[in-house]
From Swiss-Prot:
It catalyses: tRNA(Thr) + L-threonine + ATP = L-threonyl-tRNA(Thr) + AMP + diphosphate + H(+). It comes from Azoarcus sp. (strain BH72). This is Threonine--tRNA ligase. Homodimer. Binds 1 zinc ion per subunit. Signal peptide: none annotated.
Length: 638
């Protein structure tokens, strides 16, 4: 009979098969009450799961992220149950857990309204009060297909029909509502008391624009009311900081229907872009990278050799010319190998660091596009390092140090790191994987960095490190990547002459620090709420005259500051100075400079810092000294 090992190392022995719920009860009444699900030998299961042999067990409660995910998954089913009670003709499709919440897609004859959302949430609360048991049932696949067809749930029947015929499927029943799901779920709807439906959207069935547009309902669920309130407050702040809204308000960029997923950068937005790109360009140049430029449109044959045509052709923009098929490049790596292959390379030439701010195009589904965060045309701070196996650790360590410096300069110091190791299906010898994984781990440890290990999550062609930064709202953005590649140099014939005079394939390190510049600038806009530090600000200051008599002096000030290298504008309109100050405050400029008769006579300016701080009168020399200090330290008012 089963001996059950708990996370603290203790073992509980039973003389009969036992459920997860019974094990929890044997430990204590408090745990029995708090238990939501379990994890048996690494597999998440319901409390009703019966353990028949020796196993390792962890009881999941709402104190763990995994337990909260069970709550969210169950709340998605609660949402579907409520929709079916209120709108019986609606068909259910899928309802996964996502970061901080969940969604469920429905097929219905009309779009849901905000009033519908309120009614659905109210019905969900009623279902919670009923404390309906949530029970798992296992059916033969064909029986499940027939059942869902019989009740008019054709999408669900289609999903189940794609499962092999000899497999059983698990269903969950709560009251009259039955849904397909692997589970696990909470034992009763009464455990789902803290939730909120947040928004409505459209989504194509299976993400294909040729299919029906479904109604997507988003929601969030938490263990405690305080957690929900904190999250909703964060959403309010995020709404205020929405880069799309600030992009219009600050005259940075726009996107229009004639070019979906492609950005029209306005003068101020392009100035911001240039500050980011020029900083990155200067930084990588100082660290030994050679910047290159490769074609936008490349013959299909290269993409077939690289393997991208088979994997990415649906996401490629293609064209034809003179009976040849071409693709607008979705990434730079195959083209960089073409440069590497020009001329014989020796081990003495390695490591070779090749960078490109390459413009890439990917035909992302229209429903996934989001401002400048998710686009079809983007530029990456892309680079590839060609090196020997022995050089991997040193190159990885240098890149990690560089990445930390860049993130810190942009104001991000909280970085999360994940190391993904070999998957079951892979290329390359185990010895090469052993060395590569050890090199990446050693590079991280050399920097004193903690990381999360993700066994089996690496690409088939090499292990990788992912770097995510946390913004001022504690949102996590995955930006940086260091991906080892044992495959592409072999496929595209990249070779070098080794020290023993034999030809070998280099290891290729794909690396990016900020990733898509468009997305990173969107992150910056939201992180700073549009109030950029001086070094990034599109306009450093505006000079405003109090009356017409100071117009010439205001112009002199603008010219002097521009000659000193600053981005300064003049506002010489015949408007009251307080009106000008209020208007430019909306534009979030770091500084406002006011000149009246006193300032003109003394050859100074009255300086107001963003946020309203009054620095009084400063000479232009003092102001330039202050600004140069802020630029050098990449600081300034935020």
């Amino acid at each position: 009979m089963p001996n059950i090992k708990l996370p603290d190392g203790s073992v509980r022995s039973f003389d009969h098969p036992v459920t997860v719920a019974e094990v929890a009860a044997s430990i204590g009444s408090g745990l029995a009450k708090a238990a939501l699900a379990g994890r048996v030998d690494g597999k998440a299961v319901d409390l009703s799961y019966c353990i028949e042999r020796d196993s390792e067990l962890a009881i999941l409660t709402d104190k763990s992220a995994e337990g909260v995910d069970v709550i969210r998954h169950s709340t998605a089913h609660l949402l579907a149950h409520a929709v079916k009670e209120l709108f019986p003709e609606a068909q259910v499709t899928i309802g996964p857990v996502i970061e901080n919440g969940f969604y469920y897609d429905f097929s219905y004859k009309r779009p849901f309204t905000p009033e519908d959302l309120e009614a659905i949430e109210k019905r969900m609360a009623e279902l919670v009060k009923r404390e309906l048991p949530v029970e798992r049932e296992v059916w033969p696949r064909d029986k499940a297909v027939a059942f869902f067809k019989s009740i008019g749930e054709h999408y669900k029947a289609e999903i189940i029909a794609s499962i092999p015929a000899n497999e059983d499927v698990s269903l969950y029943r709560q009251g009259e509502f039955v849904d397909l799901c692997r589970g696990p779920h909470v034992p009763s709807t009464g455990r789902l008391k803290v939730f909120k439906l947040t928004k409505l959207a459209g989504a194509y069935w299976r993400g294909d624009a040729k299919n029906e547009m479904l109604q997507r309902v988003y929601g969030t669920a938490w263990a405690k009311k305080e957690d929900l309130e904190s999250y909703l407050h964060m959403l309010e702040e995020a709404e205020k900081r929405d880069h799309r809204k600030l992009g219009r308000q600050l005259d940075l960029f726009h996107i229009q229907e004639e070019a979906p997923g492609m950005v029209f950068w306005h003068a101020k937005g392009w100035t911001l872009w240039q500050q980011v790109e020029q900083y990155l360009r200067g930084t990588i140049s100082r660290h030994g990278y050679q910047e290159v430029r490769t074609p936008q449109i490349v013959d299909r044959s290269l993409w077939e050799k690289s393997g991208h045509w088979g994997m990415y052709s649906d996401l490629m923009f293609t064209t034809q010319s003179e009976k040849h098929d071409y693709a607008v490049k979705p990434m730079n790596c195959p083209c960089h190998i073409q440069i590497f292959n020009q001329g014989l390379k020796s081990y003495r030439d390695l490591p070779l660091r090749m960078a490109e701010f390459g413009s890439c195009h990917r035909n992302e589904p229209s429903g996934s596009l989001h401002g400048i965060m998710r686009v079809r045309n983007f530029v990456q701070d892309d680079a590839h390092i060609f090196c020997t196996d022995e050089q991997v650790q040193e190159e990885a360590a240098a890149f990690i140090a560089l990445l930390q410096k860049v993130y810190a300069d942009f104001g991000f110091r909280d970085i999360q790191i994940k190391l993904s190791t070999r998957p079951e299906k892979r290329v390359g010898a185990d010895e090469q994987w052993d060395a590569a994984e050890a090199a990446l781990a050693a590079a991280l440890k050399a920097q004193g960095l903690e990381y999360e290990l993700q066994p089996g999550e690496g690409a088939f062609y090499g292990p990788k490190i992912e770097f995510s930064l946390k913004d001022c709202l504690n949102r996590v953005w995955q930006c940086g990547t260091l991906q080892l590649d044992f495959n592409l140099p072999v496929r595209l014939g990249a070779e070098y002459v080794a020290e023993d005079n034999t030809k070998k394939f280099p290891v290729m390190l794909h690396r990016a620090i900020v990733g898509s510049l468009e997305r990173f600038i969107g992150i910056l806009i939201e992180h700073y709420a549009g109030a950029m530090p001086l070094w990034l600000a599109p306009v450093h200051a505006v000079v405003m005259n109090i009356s017409e008599g100071q117009a010439d002096y205001a112009t002199e000030v603008v010219n002097r500051l521009r000659e000193a290298g600053f981005r300064v504008e003049a506002d010489l309109r015949n408007e009251k100075i307080n009106y000008k100050i209020r208007e430019h405050s909306v534009h979030k400029l770091p500084y406002q400079l006011v000149v009246g008769e006193k300032e003109k006579a003394a050859g100074v300016v009255a300086v107001r810092v963003r946020g309203g701080q009054d620095l009084g009168q400063l000479s232009l020399d003092k102001l330039i000294e202050r600004w140069n200090g802020e630029l050098a330290s990449r600081s300034g008012p935020v």
